[in-house]
Amino acid sequence: GGDYSQGTPYQDGYQKGWEILALAEMQVDFCTLGNHEFDVGDQAVENSWVNARKNRLRYGVYHKLPQLLVSNMFIKYNANGEPISYTSADIRPNDLSTNAFGAGAYAKTGAKNYAIRQVAGYRVGLFALEGEESYGYCKNSDLTRMDCAEVARVYARFLKEEKGCDLVIAISHCGMEEDRATARAQEGFLDVIQNAHDHLAYDQPIVENGVIM
């Protein structure tokens, strides 16, 4: 759910990809970015994934790296330095060209818009959201984001109707209040929001508009 970096002396090796290699050792399948991944700038995010991939075997990590998912983060400026205005038409799950970490400036992260995994006979679709509050902490970033509720509606419908998924999960770095607002705006296609950013533990799942969090 993001914030896999920061908080310990391990952060000194962030751009070397140490935290990502630790996720691989834990056999984490998917992850997304939180605000702390941007603490030393956008380029550091790409550097960490490039170096993790390059140094995996050197550091004795034999499990594959997690798949990075990014679904609502876009390049903020065009080649002329002018701000880019995005609309709902720019939310295109099958098109990596607008994804800043897919085919944009930091494509070497290897990020994808979404992923599909077969689990216990079920077809599970996943995508990822960066929240408004979380992204407000990313002071060094030249990226922008689109509204989580709007992106979630498009991706959830796409994964259910076009990709035939039985279950759709949003990996979120938004915080519970934003996640609840996202859940209330859904149309019955999103099943689960895997919540992060708050760093809180919940004894029981929270259900909003049929979405489990």
Enumerate the predicted regions with their spans.
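Acidic, metal/ion-coordinating pockets
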Residues: 1-213
